Swiss-Prot record:
GO BP term, pick one: L-methionine salvage from methylthioadenosine
Subunit record text: Monomer.
UniProt key word Magnesium: yes
Protein name per its UniProtKB record: Enolase-phosphatase E1
UniProt pathway annotation: Amino-acid biosynthesis; L-methionine biosynthesis via salvage pathway; L-methionine from S-methyl-5-thio-alpha-D-ribose 1-phosphate: step 3/6; Amino-acid biosynthesis; L-methionine biosynthesis via salvage pathway; L-methionine from S-methyl-5-thio-alpha-D-ribose 1-phosphate: step 4/6
Residue sites binding Mg(2+) per the record: 10, 12, 194
Function, as annotated: Bifunctional enzyme that catalyzes the enolization of 2,3-diketo-5-methylthiopentyl-1-phosphate (DK-MTP-1-P) into the intermediate 2-hydroxy-3-keto-5-methylthiopentenyl-1-phosphate (HK-MTPenyl-1-P), which is then dephosphorylated to form the acireductone 1,2-dihydroxy-3-keto-5-methylthiopentene (DHK-MTPene).
Cofactor annotation remark: Binds 1 Mg(2+) ion per subunit.
Gene Ontology molecular function: any one: magnesium ion binding
EC class: hydrolase
Length: 235
């Protein structure tokens, strides 16, 4: 395998299980949502300088006229896994409280922490590109379960990207935007994700890209025109 000095990683299904997001983060958010909405007056005052109100006001106005209407709309977004940037902002606030209270910790795949340590020793730069907000990405990597303790792994990560900063993960232009921001050539970078559409977009940008196969991920047939890896051990 060629030598790369820039490693770009997806999160869900790549460094941690899809079930962590679906079975831990999403339910936690939905459980806290009613309490969050109880703290806000409806209809929303769009001139309010309270952070939560400002975020809620970004949802379509037809859904923000009442608490129940907005709650139903947000629940539908989550149920359908809609990558809505306003939803991501709101989730980030709720998850931050959960992480800080010790109610949320993330289990990374066993090979991930070892790889991050190895890449740092090899002077390689690691970046995260996820559909989750940059705030949520940083929270996740700063609250990692490791044996009997919680570790902060943000010192291993040089930078973070999300769709609001560089564009959609299934568009090749987004990966070119990352390279431009890093002042890197495509040949110096490698991208890893469990999502074939994301890998295809990255390849179109000229970046070496690998499909990560983890337990519980979507089944892909190895005869497709992609390179697969089952862990980060040989990356």
């Amino acid at each position: 395998m060629a030598v790369y000095d820039t490693i770009i990683l997806d999160i869900e299904g790549t460094v941690c299980s899809i079930s962590f997001v679906k079975n831990v983060l999403f339910p936690y958010f939905l459980d806290k949502l009613p309490f969050l909405l109880e703290q806000v007056e409806f209809p929303l005052d769009h001139t309010d300088n309270v952070t939560v109100t400002q975020i809620l006001a970004k949802f379509p106005e037809r859904y923000t006229k009442s608490k129940e209407c907005l709650k139903t709309y947000i629940n539908e977004l989550v149920a359908n896994d809609i990558k809505d940037p306003t939803l991501k902002q709101l989730q980030g606030i709720v998850w931050q409280a959960g992480y800080e209270e010790g109610e949320i910790v993330v289990d990374l795949y066993n090979d991930v922490i070892e790889a991050l340590d190895r890449w740092k020793k090899e002077d390689k730069s690691v970046y995260i590109y996820s559909s989750g907000s940059i705030k949520a990405q940083k929270l996740l990597f700063s609250h990692v379960k490791f044996k009997s303790e919680t570790r902060d792994l943000t010192n291993y990560i040089k930078g973070y990207y999300d769709p609001t900063s560089v564009g959609s993960k299934i568009e090749s232009e987004s990966y070119l935007n990352i390279l431009k921001d890093l002042n890197k050539d495509p040949e110096s970078a490698i991208f890893l994700s469990d999502n074939i559409k994301e890998v295809a977009a990255s390849i179109r940008a000229g970046i070496k890209s690998l499909v990560v196969k983890r337990p519980g991920n979507t089944v892909h047939h190895d005869n497709q025109s992609f390179d697969f890896v089952y862990s980060f051990d040989n990356v």
